[in-house]
């Protein structure tokens, strides 16, 4: 199935219009020059130089005679002159002389026309391209005139000047000039792409490094928090932690309760006190018999470093009670 052809863009339409206008202008110029009798009958100087002839003399309708290093053969072509070398009777072509003569004709044409360098470069390029088939034609004619006993001379000698001419034509600076702006533009675009890629990669590396640093910092903080929680935690999970304020409050309540109980016991002892006479008599009897009885009174005991224990309070929850300066012995 044929694919649909897209409509031409406005840019292409503009180019087509310019091309058509150029073709119309060229046709008009060709029609104007065709009216001249000299333009159709007498060829240009470049065509005459390619034919190895002189330029058209004034009022003539054909090129002039052959150049100095050429001679006209039976068919009317200008061929190189025969040069007999010592010891050999074979004719040898002089391509250097032919090229030099063509170059002289082109230089003479440039001087007469007075063209600028921009117009001379395409002419030189066209001459270099047209010299190659002219040289091959001269060598083919020279090979036909050789003796039939030496057929290998034409096959071995013809490709040598062909390669030299092609190398000379390809080494011209005219063919490399149109490629310079395109190469500069391509190099600039490549440099811009490389710079953009380097900036993007450096930004990505910076973001990755920042994220990695933040992650490491968070990991360290969590490790420190876990270590502090395990180090400061209780040895056994069943025993609750008691603050120092709670311990002091419990000790104050215990001391208050102890003082209250002591006051009550003292009051009861005062109401149930026996007569002093009986006590004195019994003490005398005991002293006489030598049997001594020791009584301990809580109020007379030293209270410097004595620990107070109240049976009504549970001391297992307290780690270590703070002994007060006025601690009293436990009740009995």
From Swiss-Prot:
Superkingdom of origin: Eukaryota
Membrane-protein topology: Single-pass membrane protein
Keywords on record: Membrane, Phosphoprotein, Signal, Transmembrane, Transmembrane helix
Family: Belongs to the NPDC1/cab-1 family.
Modified residues (Phosphoserine): 236
Composition bias type Acidic residues, residue spans: 282-291
Pro residues composition bias: residue spans: 322-332
Pfam family, one: NPDC1
Primary subcellular site in the record, as a coarse category: membrane
Biological source species: Mus musculus
Gene symbol of the encoding locus: Npdc1
Bias-annotated ranges (Polar residues): 153-174
Signal sequence annotation: 1-34
Residues covered by region (Disordered): 145-182, 272-300, 312-332
Role this protein plays: Suppresses oncogenic transformation in neural and non-neural cells and down-regulates neural cell proliferation. Might be involved in transcriptional regulation.
TM annotation in the entry: 191-211
Protein name: Neural proliferation differentiation and control protein 1
UniProt cross-references to InterPro entries, sorted A to Z: NPDC1
Tissue distribution of the protein: Expressed in the brain and nervous system. Not detected in liver, heart, skeletal muscle, spleen, pancreas, pituitary and adrenal glands. Expression increases when cultured neural cells are growth-arrested and begin to differentiate.
């Amino acid at each position: 199935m044929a694919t649909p052809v897209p409509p031409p863009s406005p840019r292409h339409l503009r180019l087509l219009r310019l091309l058509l206008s150029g073709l119309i202008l060229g046709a008009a110029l060709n029609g104007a020059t065709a009216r001249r009798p000299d333009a159709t009958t007498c060829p240009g100087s470049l065509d005459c130089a390619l034919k190895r002839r002189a330029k058209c003399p004034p009022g003539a309708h054909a090129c002039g005679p052959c150049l100095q290093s050429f001679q006209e053969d039976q068919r009317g072509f200008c061929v190189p002159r025969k040069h007999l070398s010592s010891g050999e009777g074979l004719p040898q072509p002089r391509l250097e002389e032919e090229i030099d003569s063509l170059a002289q004709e082109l230089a003479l044409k440039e001087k007469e026309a007075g063209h600028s360098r921009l117009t001379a470069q395409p002419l030189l390029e066209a001459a270099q391209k047209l010299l190659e088939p002219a040289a091959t034609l001269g060598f083919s004619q020279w090979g036909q005139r050789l003796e039939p006993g030496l057929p290998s001379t034409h096959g071995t000698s013809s490709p040598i000047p062909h390669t030299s001419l092609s190398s000379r034509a390809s080494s011209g600076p005219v063919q490399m000039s149109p490629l310079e702006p395109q190469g500069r533009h391509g190099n600039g675009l490549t440099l811009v792409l490389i710079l953009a890629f380097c900036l993007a990669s450096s930004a990505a590396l910076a973001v990755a490094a920042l994220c990695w640093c933040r992650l490491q910092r968070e990991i360290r903080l969590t490790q420190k928090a876990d270590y502090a929680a395990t180090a400061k935690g209780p040895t056994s999970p069943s025993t609750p932690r008691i603050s120092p304020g709670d311990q002091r409050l419990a000790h104050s309540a215990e001391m208050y309760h102890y003082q209250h109980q002591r006051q009550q016991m003292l009051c009861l002892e005062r109401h149930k006190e026996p007569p002093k006479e009986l006590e004195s008599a019994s003490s005398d009897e005991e002293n006489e018999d030598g049997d001594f009885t020791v009584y301990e009174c809580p109020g007379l005991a030293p209270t410097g470093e004595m620990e107070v224990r109240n049976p009504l309070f549970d001391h297992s929850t307290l780690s270590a009670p703070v002994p007060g300066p006025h601690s009293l012995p436990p009740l009995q």
